[in-house]
UniProtKB/Swiss-Prot annotation:
<comment type="similarity">
    <text>Belongs to the purine/pyrimidine phosphoribosyltransferase family.</text>
</comment>
<dbReference type="GO" id="GO:0006168">
    <property type="term" value="P:adenine salvage"/>
</dbReference>
<dbReference type="InterPro" id="IPR029057">
    <property type="entry name" value="PRTase-like"/>
</dbReference>
<dbReference type="InterPro" id="IPR000836">
    <property type="entry name" value="PRibTrfase_dom"/>
</dbReference>
<keyword id="KW-0808">Transferase</keyword>
<dbReference type="GO" id="GO:0044209">
    <property type="term" value="P:AMP salvage"/>
</dbReference>
<dbReference type="GO" id="GO:0016208">
    <property type="term" value="F:AMP binding"/>
</dbReference>
<keyword id="KW-0328">Glycosyltransferase</keyword>
<keyword id="KW-0963">Cytoplasm</keyword>
<dbReference type="GO" id="GO:0006166">
    <property type="term" value="P:purine ribonucleoside salvage"/>
</dbReference>
<dbReference type="GO" id="GO:0005737">
    <property type="term" value="C:cytoplasm"/>
</dbReference>
<comment type="subunit">
    <text>Homodimer.</text>
</comment>
<keyword id="KW-0660">Purine salvage</keyword>
<dbReference type="InterPro" id="IPR005764">
    <property type="entry name" value="Ade_phspho_trans"/>
</dbReference>
<protein>
    <recommendedName>
        <fullName>Adenine phosphoribosyltransferase</fullName>
        <ecNumber>2.4.2.7</ecNumber>
    </recommendedName>
</protein>
<dbReference type="Pfam" id="PF00156">
    <property type="entry name" value="Pribosyltran"/>
</dbReference>
<dbReference type="InterPro" id="IPR050054">
    <property type="entry name" value="UPRTase/APRTase"/>
</dbReference>
């Protein structure tokens, strides 16, 4: 990825101060998604390391991970697996509790979403502390997935999430980094 594209990509992400709470800068990718060339290029850059590789499924974390993950699944000719908040999937599910800044939450996946041994890429729009992605990787592994990578458009490196995922043995692909949280 060229430095020019990285700068263009950063410029296409809207910064919303003090959302969802004071002191937080929310990185809104809906502006990037609304720019066809930037969106297409971001997807191309995210999948580039796996071009020609066998990827069986792409798992996207609710909700923006669905948009990016669906586009990546299309690009690599794989299936898509939604990872949702508890109670949102209609069939028998497996769940995983994960840590939030204050407290815990649960995510779920259909018990039959993955055939054991399938190669899976995990996708979300942003990685901060890595709690949700860590929970999603554990959940996918619980149902037999081989998680071969985790992809995020945005990294907030000061919060350590990408390092946490790498420590789990999962390569991480991000496109741009922003300071702060």
């Amino acid at each position: 990825m060229t430095p020019e594209f990285a700068n263009d990509l950063k410029a296409s992400v809207r910064a919303i101060p003090d959302y969802p709470k004071p002191g937080i800068i929310f990185r809104d990718i809906t502006t990037l998604l609304g720019e066809p060339r930037a969106f297409r290029r971001a997807i191309d850059e995210l999948v580039q390391p796996w071009a020609g590789s066998k990827i069986d499924k792409v798992a996207g974390i609710e909700a923006r991970g669905f948009i990016i993950g669906g586009a990546i699944a299309h690009q690599v000719s794989s299936g898509f697996v939604p990872i949702r908040k508890k109670g949102k999937l209609p069939h028998t599910c497996v769940s995983m509790e994960y840590a939030l800044e204050y407290g815990t939450d649960k995510i779920e996946v259909h018990v039959d979403a993955i055939t054991p041994g399938e190669r899976v890429i995990l996708v979300d729009d942003l990685i901060a502390t890595g709690g949700t992605a860590e929970g999603a990787i554990k959940l996918l592994r619980q149902i037999g997935a081989e998680v071969v990578a985790a992809c995020f458009v945005i990294d907030l490196p000061e919060l350590g999430g990408a390092a946490k995922i790498r420590a789990m043995g999962v390569p991480v692909r991000t496109l741009v980094a922003f300071e702060g949280h």
